[in-house]
Amino acid sequence: MTEENKKGRLFIVTAPSGAGKTSLIKALIELCPQFKVSTSHTTRKPRQGEREGIDYYFVDNDAFNTLKNSGEFLENAECHGAKYGTAKSPVEESIKTGKDIILEIDYQGAINVKKVFPMQSVYLSFHLQWLF
């Protein structure tokens, strides 16, 4: 396969809340800076230190529902009263241009993404107990 035809891969990271997904991804990015991390949309309020467009796209319920209803999300879920969604177009663009991308999403979202991109998806799931 020529470099021109190479498709990017999706690395889907899923684990329970607080298991260290974000820390694992940050370490991976330090080791492999060619990876891109997908930025999700959420309706929750920003936490201290989180940056718009880097950590998340912070939107209200109406904006989220508009994106969802227009088919803009590859996957979406509700967790602890907040909505989360992965925009389809940046993921498709990364795959098309041969760039690897990391998605930090829940288990159900991972299943949905693997259905859309079965050949490009690498699924990584862990529990904190497995690491120690």
Outline where the language-model segments fall.
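Residue-level preference for the first positions of well-ordered beta-strands
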Residues: 8-12, 100-102
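Conserved phosphate-donor/acceptor-positioning beta-strand/loop module used by diverse small-molecule
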Residues: 101-106, 116-132
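P-loop (Walker A) phosphate-binding loop of NTP-binding proteins
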Residues: 14-16
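Post-Walker A helix-loop "phosphate-sensing" segment adjacent to the P-loop in P-loop NTPases
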Residues: 29-38
